[in-house]
Amino acid sequence: MPLCESGTSDRLRWRGCQKITRGAYTFYDEVQYARFAFPPFYYGLEDALSLRGLWEQETNPVIITPRKVRNGIRQFDSRNYIVRRIKRKMFFGYTLLQYEQFYIPVSDIEKTLIDLVYFGIRVPDEVISTMIGKLNRETFNSYLTELPQYLSNRMRIIVRKKKW
């Protein structure tokens, strides 16, 4: 596990550890390793689109967790990452994807589309059309049954408009 032992911060810095957040340190200097401070979690939204090759833009890592954490932009190793809280019953729909030497949980295409609507994130229409073209009907319909009614109805309208 890439987290360091706890101890005084001066001693940790001397050993090469970097602080992620209160109580969490790592030896790695890549911002994607900030995730270990927020278990359980998955990468979602724009970051999931980037990691799955659906969006070419470089994005800040977006960590989605059901834990009670402060939402917003944080910094690690002078790079930004975003932490978002999601309801426990909405915490599903991710798979492990290899990233460098680790496997990281990344939301699948169906859940990424749902999360984009849930969090009110706007992405270009061509990205949405590409996502809808790659949706697995069975998986998407099973996810719709897990959602609150208002969100499920909204997702059906969006998918119908894009002619799926």
Question: What is each stretch, according to the model?
Answer:
Residues 1-4, 55, 150:
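Short coil/loop linkers at secondary-structure junctions
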Residues 8, 21-26, 86-92, 103-105, ...:
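Short amphipathic alpha-helical segments, especially helix-boundary/capping motifs
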Residues 1-45:
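Short beta-edge/loop segments at beta->alpha junctions of small alpha/beta modules
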